[in-house]
Amino acid sequence: MGCYHFHLNQLSRGKGQSAIDAVCINQIGNHIFEMVNAVAEKKQRRALDLYYELLALKEPPMRILFLLVRQYRILFHVQSLQVKGYGRKEIAEKAGLHPFAAGKYMEQTRYFKMEELRAVLEESAELEERVKTGRLTDTLAVELFLVKYSS
């Protein structure tokens, strides 16, 4: 169910804006997590479809990029803790994650090498700089990011 339909349904039931926002934000977070999965699994079409769905929900491309990069930072942190021999519980504590989420991130890290995650983070900083200096549109920057890392 899209945020729009949920919004109308909740308004008719007298629910507050905060409940609506919480579900919409959760939906966006789920899309971002799924997008990272699609990129990791080299499912380019799926990654782009999720991106276009977020754009249809009026999510700004730079916010999408920010959320993607946040996920990759978490993956980098989780993987660095795994390399040091920490288990799920310790990773959850050190990374400030719920143990379930830590487990999900640990599953995602199997698709990446540390060098790849580092490269993703460096590339995202370069893309952001190119957008801010007007050398690249924000929409295209996210598309390039998704295409590059899902091929």
Label each residue range with its predicted role.
Residues 7, 56-79, 116-151:
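Amphipathic alpha-helical interaction/assembly segments
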Residues 12-116:
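Small-residue-rich helix-loop
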Residues 4, 43, 50, 120-123:
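Amphipathic, well-ordered alpha-helical segments in soluble domains
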Residues 1-15:
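Amphipathic alpha-helical "lid/sensor" segments that cap RecA-like P-loop NTPase cores
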